[in-house]
Amino acid sequence: MTDVDLAFDEQEYIPAVAQDADSGDVLMLAYVTEEALRKTRETGEAHYYSRSRDELWHKGGTSGHTQAVKEVRVDCDGDALLYIVDQTGGACHTGYESCFHRTVDGETVGEQVFDPDDVY
């Protein structure tokens, strides 16, 4: 499937960070299975694996807030991926541009770009 060895964990997941191709902002962290990575590469749109729902997940399949994957990179240990994406709409299901929209002190630092009640 790839030209490099990937180190999936014992549950057959590998973490994937999504990064905005234009701004460089980190948008989200999710998990990928071999099937999710294959679908991402086949379609050019981000696919992840929802551990809570135990199913393959096409990012934006419900909301329309898709991620067009420009490149997939792997870290030096082969145990993490970086999806460099063109994000349509917000990446976070809470309506924010990034899932990393809060500090550990509780301060909101991100921008809410849609109302989740209108989408889900």
Swiss-Prot record:
GO terms for biological process: L-histidine biosynthetic process. Mg(2+) binds at D75, D77, D79. One of its GO terms (cellular component) is cytoplasm. Its cofactor is Mg(2+); Zn(2+). Pathway: Amino-acid biosynthesis; L-histidine biosynthesis; L-histidine from 5-phospho-alpha-D-ribose 1-diphosphate: step 3/9. InterPro entries: PRA-CH, PRib_AMP_CycHydrolase_dom, PRib_AMP_CycHydrolase_sf. It catalyses: 1-(5-phospho-beta-D-ribosyl)-5'-AMP + H2O = 1-(5-phospho-beta-D-ribosyl)-5-[(5-phospho-beta-D-ribosylamino)methylideneamino]imidazole-4-carboxamide. Disulfide bonds: none annotated. Its main location: cytoplasm. Pfam families: PRA-CH. Homodimer. Belongs to the PRA-CH family. This is Phosphoribosyl-AMP cyclohydrolase. It comes from Haloarcula marismortui (strain ATCC 43049 / DSM 3752 / JCM 8966 / VKM B-1809) (Halobacterium marismortui).
